[in-house]
Amino acid sequence: MEFEYWIELVNKIVNIVTGPAVIFSVWFLVAQIRTQIKVGKAASRQSIAEAHQEVTLAGLDPLLMRAKLKLIKKEELSIDEEVGLRIHMTAILRARENHFYQHKMGMLDDEEWKTMRKALGTLFIDNQLNLDIWKKSKSTFNPEFVSIVDEEIDMRKDTFRK
């Protein structure tokens, strides 16, 4: 009888300790998940900053700089210059599409995405070449992203030179 008493007492103590331990474990897991989400978002922002910097620095290539100056001066581009600008613009659009995916997955908050959308729209202001690139390549992009870009272009259509 004394043995059964001790077994029952230990069983009750284990039951008492188990409840709070489970609650603490769940709380700890939730805290870890929240931390990992913050780390993931920070890594995503860092990745976006690096990608943006890469594309921006690539735009400083002498061929692209020469081509951009010609566009500003309304001079005709060589084949190499036009191809370079087309490839560069496509890379920019792919990077922005990636930002769109990250926003959809919750890795970018709404404020960041709104800012990126505005910047996306400015790529087309007074730039017939970029508009042409978009028209010819938009079928290769996510349909939701296409709608967003088209909306941004439409909002700025009054800024395009005829």
Kindly give the residue locations of the regions a language model identified:
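An amphipathic alpha-helical interaction surface
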Residues: E81-K162
